[in-house]
Amino acid sequence: MNRAKKEQVVAELHEKLQRASAAILTDFKGLTVAEMTDLRGALAAEKVEYQVVKNTLMRLASKDTGAEALVPILKGTCAVAIGYGDPSIPAKIIKKFNKTNEKLAIKAGALGIRLLNSDQVAALAELPPREELLAKLLGTLNALPTGLVTVLSGVPRAFVGVLAAIQRKREEA
């Protein structure tokens, strides 16, 4: 690959990494072409890009991006899964692929500017989808004012009940 081509690859990868919500670094040593094609297909179906990269080019492309945290991990054979939407999707697909093919190893991940080790990437894969998390948060936030209104309305309701009981006693007497 000549210098101009390398510069083009670095520029394209840099742009992708800047837009990425998550980047997962994997070691693909031992995967056959068919297995790699299956993995790429599964990732592409969810709009996640999977690219084999030279470590030096990845090091250059990741400057001033969230994936810069991955630079110390760049050793051996590396490929990067770049997700643009829900950050858990690349981790979920790779973890699911790992159930049937243990040759693919998760090296690390970058979520924003935070470096995730392989265990943290696996934990990210266990998270529910973003929409579900937002729905749970909204439900929790909605429950707080509802509970507060119930508690606050309980005091006047009890006071009115006491007044009604006093009035009934006076009417009976």
Curated annotation (Swiss-Prot):
Subunit structure: Part of the ribosomal stalk of the 50S ribosomal subunit. The N-terminus interacts with L11 and the large rRNA to form the base of the stalk. The C-terminus forms an elongated spine to which L12 dimers bind in a sequential fashion forming a multimeric L10(L12)X complex.
GO biological process: translation
Organism: Syntrophobacter fumaroxidans (strain DSM 10017 / MPOB)
Family, as annotated: Belongs to the universal ribosomal protein uL10 family.
SUPFAM superfamilies assigned: Ribosomal protein L10-like
Record keywords, A-Z: Ribonucleoprotein, Ribosomal protein, RNA-binding, rRNA-binding
GO CC terms in record: large ribosomal subunit
Gene Ontology MF terms: large ribosomal subunit rRNA binding; structural constituent of ribosome
Name listed for the protein in its UniProt record: Large ribosomal subunit protein uL10
